[in-house]
Design a protein with these regions (language model features):
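An amphipathic, hydrophobic-aromatic interaction surface with interspersed Lys/Arg
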Residues: 1-272
Length: 272
């Protein structure tokens, strides 16, 4: 896009957003949720477009405000991938890939992109809290608990503190340290991870892996199955140790085991 005889790069997909771009979009969403600005899909896109341009040094020049507003409208029209409208007139901010753009927030460190550092117990509890929030979105403690579970203080090496079952109350209190827009950002990241595991292809050990079968029909992944039952079943088999040790096993390791078991079961069914 050309303006003032120079080109600027604007994002056309979530992967191209900068952390500041994502923060701006989250803040726009929160201001609308709080009733501080008019909440329409067109306004959401326009406000976000104006912030993206401002971050790249493009503001309304004196005497050329009409040209600037036309530019904002043009950029806003391209943001259908970030702000998505629904048939009922509602709209939502979309994170369609679990890249971690929030990073450190209020001194707390978030999970790695694509859940690479998540443990099974952390995932299990996050799915439970996520379900509670979606069933009762008016209760602010659900978002606080989710954010406080996923965003934790740094350890001595400066990395995110290891997961431990501190209890919902502790997670809620830690989540209070985050701003409401950051709490919703934790929710957006978690839902994008769940969708990614159910739909995308992962490369693990140089091989392509699809976890989709675990999230379909009578598979046992994500919200579709009982994660507590999976934990206890794995503990009984001692493949990862006790139930507590299962909770402290990397999420992707557990999902790979479940996928192998699922494929073996399918082979047995076909052989009969």
């Amino acid at each position: 896009m050309k303006t003032k005889k120079r080109y600027i790069e604007l994002p056309s997909a979530f992967e191209e957003l900068t952390p500041q771009d994502w923060k701006d979009a989250l803040v726009v969403r929160q201001r609308m949720a709080d009733g501080r600005v008019r909440a329409t899909l067109a306004d959401a896109r326009r406000l976000t477009a104006a912030r993206q341009l401002a971050r790249r040094g493009v503001t309304a020049p004196r005497g050329r405000r009409t040209d600037y507003l036309l530019l904002v409208a043009r950029v806003a029209d391209s943001l259908t991938w970030l702000w998505r409208g629904q048939d009922d007139g509602s709209f939502t901010l979309v994170q369609d890939t679990p890249l971690q753009l929030m990073g450190e927030a209020e001194g707390l460190h978030g999970p790695a992109s694509f859940g690479q550092d998540m443990l099974f117990g952390e995932w299990r509890l996050a799915c439970t809290i996520l379900t509670q929030y979606e069933q009762d979105p008016e209760n602010p403690n659900h978002l606080r608990a989710l954010a406080g579970l996923l965003w934790r203080p740094a350890d001595r090496q400066g990395r995110r503190q290891a997961y431990d079952a501190d209890g919902i109350t502790a997670y809620v209190e830690r989540g209070r340290r985050l701003q409401p827009w950051q709490q919703w950002g934790a929710y957006a990241w978690m839902t994008s991870l769940l969708a990614s595991l159910a739909e995308d292809t992962y490369t693990i050990g140089g091989e392509s892996v699809e976890f989709a079968p675990l999230f379909q029909g009578d598979g046992d992944g994500g919200k579709g199955g009982s994660l507590e039952r999976i934990r206890l079943t794995l503990a009984q088999s001692h493949v990862f140790g006790t139930a507590d040790e299962v909770d402290h096993t990397p999420l992707l390791t557990v999902l790979l085991k479940l996928l192998m078991d699922h494929e073996e079961l399918l082979k047995l069914k076909k052989s009969k």
